Amino acid sequence: MKFLVLVAFVGVTVAFPISDEDDDKIVGGYSCARSAAPYQVSLNSGYHFCGGSLISSQWVLSAAHCYKSSIQVKLGEYNLAAQDGSEQTISSSKVIRHSGYNANTLNNDIMLIKLSKAATLNSYVNTVPLPTSCVTAGTTCLISGWGNTLSSGSLYPDVLQCLNAPVLSSSQCSSAYPGRITSNMICIGYLNGGKDSCQGDSGGPVVCNGQLQGIVSWGIGCAQKGYPGVYTKVCNYVSWIKTTMSSN
């Protein structure tokens, strides 16, 4: 589930960003409208490996499991295989993982990237607001990314993919992943399967009612029945985000 690669290992589901051999997209979604997600960024290291969200002109929010010490951030991207004229590529000056990030449990799977210069904001590159409160179950959210579009096999569209999916209740989430869901995680998607984020979507945005409520984190497979995507619960980190940005 989500914008990452997921591998079941010793009973634990672990999320990985994609490698240069493995790109990814959303399963069961649709091609986004050209400026549907101007906050969406592509994290690059010679290839797209994760997504992220522009939250100010100089800061991007992503998943801690996407960490690299140096990252090229591509903003205004839509078709990865074409130059649309709207792209901005800015290198990172700082990459800051949450100090409580646990690579085994994926608790606190959140990371800030400071850009080496401010992005130029326009209709194709813009920020997404942080949450003013936590999202409620049943709310429909927009997930986007360049991840795998197949739940079995690989098909990698170049155009940004979108998916509308509901927030599940905490009880539904915990029942799907017994003993694995912390208070810093939310489940979003369909228990019947068929629609989900997937490998390569990791770190990307979940926007609900115009606010950034989730970060693609982990799951078992992609779009598998009974296993919705698991996302970092951004509303728990607003203070950490603001404090980290102001002190760096």
Curated annotation (Swiss-Prot):
Alphabetically ordered keywords of this record: Calcium, Digestion, Disulfide bond, Hydrolase, Metal-binding, Protease, Secreted, Serine protease, Signal, Zymogen
Signal peptide residue numbers: 1-15
Reaction catalysed by this enzyme: Preferential cleavage: Arg-|-Xaa, Lys-|-Xaa
Necessary cofactors: Ca(2+)
Compartments in which it is found: Secreted, Extracellular space
PROSITE patterns from the UniProt entry: TRYPSIN_DOM, TRYPSIN_HIS, TRYPSIN_SER
Domain Peptidase S1: 26-246
GO biological process, one term: digestion
Domain of life: Eukaryota
Disulfide bond positions: 32-162, 50-66, 134-235, 141-208, 173-187, 198-222
Molecular function terms from GO: metal ion binding; serine-type endopeptidase activity
Tissue specificity comment: High levels are seen in the pancreas while lower levels are found in the liver, spleen and thymus.
Cofactor comment: Binds 1 Ca(2+) ion per subunit.
Main location as per UniProt: secreted
Keyword Metal-binding: yes
Site positions for Required for specificity: 196
Keyword Disulfide bond: yes
Family membership: Belongs to the peptidase S1 family.
Protein name: Trypsin I-P1
Origin species: Gallus gallus (Chicken)
Biological classification of the source: Eukaryota, Metazoa, Chordata, Craniata, Vertebrata
